[in-house]
């Protein structure tokens, strides 16, 4: 009874060479129709699955390998005499090596196929054989990745068989492969069927490794970046293209995500500068260069080594301005050719990053890892519920423009946060303080440090004011209008303080905590 290898692959990469090497090593090659045809065309002696089972492929190939003579050969425990006796009685022979990859479900979805074609590309027999082989890895070598053909052949040539360690590694890879495959299917069908089940009792999320990163948040931490195969239509920082410069770091990805999410809030030409996941300068202007210079002037100290994001293509004037200080990453929908050439010549290590689907919204929910589990929530894509003026004085049109600008910015600042703004540019940003009044003081100190006048500015707070103290302080710095969610039990006291100081106040009815 010679050794047998079952090969049934949709991805034919390297399969002919693999089968030829197995044939040289004395393996009988068993294959299903499509793969068998390719192997036969290349001079390989193949036994078709239907010849083993005595049963033809039916229903257009839907049923071909789901048969006891296949699965018995895969699942037989070779050191169990009773199992082997049953195998012999049923005329079943063990299968030693299995090479399978599955119907191209993901690729079918990406090409825009209709639902019938998508469902037809859900593999049934393939995963069954993969799982059976992986379960019986003590005796069976399962290969789901063409990249592993070479190492298996080398080991067979050197040792005559694969080691248990190799079979375990390949079995684990196989189980991951089928789990990934099924999670892609469930994610896609959830969307295609239009079933609004936001938080199902059980779910899995597929991710595919894109790159191993140099390290994680700190040098002693290892890290990698993964992409979602089912969120391919939406904005994707994970699949961003580094057009020039060093590879992206873990922290670069986090900062780019923060910068892109904020700059996309604006329809007008805008620039955002981010440092350690918080904006340090944001501005709107008529050109990308002017927006950048305005944003930079708000906190040039923090901007050093920062990430700069635009919502317009980078032109040559902007490129020249960007080379004046050290920056880590420039993010934009695109780069004009002369701007790109200038930046690549002047800054060899500066990362120039083009975001995939910049004009689209990010897909999927927001996940946060906690010990022993995960938190899942909707993305914070809304801006406000209703704009309601709650004070005696209404904001002027210009103040309202600045209030809405500041509100968009504060939504993306770590809580507790306060943003002071004027003329569609930040004046001071107070992020991540444990009290709201401290956030205000931090924002004011930043403004004072860079000689930015707070007189006539506006203030945004991402959550309500628990006391009137922040409003009293804001008045001392010449702030003329405030935007906040409202909802405090002391709202009346806060509104009274605003009225006393002649400050216009707008409630949004929506909080934007960010942790």
From Swiss-Prot:
Record GO biological process: 'de novo' IMP biosynthetic process
GO MF terms, alphabetically ordered: IMP cyclohydrolase activity; phosphoribosylaminoimidazolecarboxamide formyltransferase activity
Keywords: Hydrolase, Multifunctional enzyme, Purine biosynthesis, Transferase
Tagged with keyword Transport: no
InterPro entries per record: AICAR_Tfase_dup_dom_sf, Cytidine_deaminase-like, MGS-like_dom, MGS-like_dom_sf, PurH-like
Gene3D superfamilies found in the cross-reference section: 3.40.140.20, Methylglyoxal synthase-like domain (3.40.50.1380)
Ranges in a coiled coil: none
Signal peptide positions on this chain: none
Annotated pathway: Purine metabolism; IMP biosynthesis via de novo pathway; 5-formamido-1-(5-phospho-D-ribosyl)imidazole-4-carboxamide from 5-amino-1-(5-phospho-D-ribosyl)imidazole-4-carboxamide (10-formyl THF route): step 1/1; Purine metabolism; IMP biosynthesis via de novo pathway; IMP from 5-formamido-1-(5-phospho-D-ribosyl)imidazole-4-carboxamide: step 1/1
Pfam short name (any one): MGS
Record has Nucleus as a keyword: no
CDD domains in the record: IMPCH
A GO-annotated cellular component: cytosol
Domain MGS-like intervals: 1-144
Swiss-Prot/TrEMBL domain comment: The IMP cyclohydrolase activity resides in the N-terminal region.
Similarity comment text for this entry: Belongs to the PurH family.
Protein name: Bifunctional purine biosynthesis protein PurH
Taxonomic lineage from the root: Bacteria, Pseudomonadati, Aquificota, Aquificia, Aquificales
Gene that this sequence comes from: purH
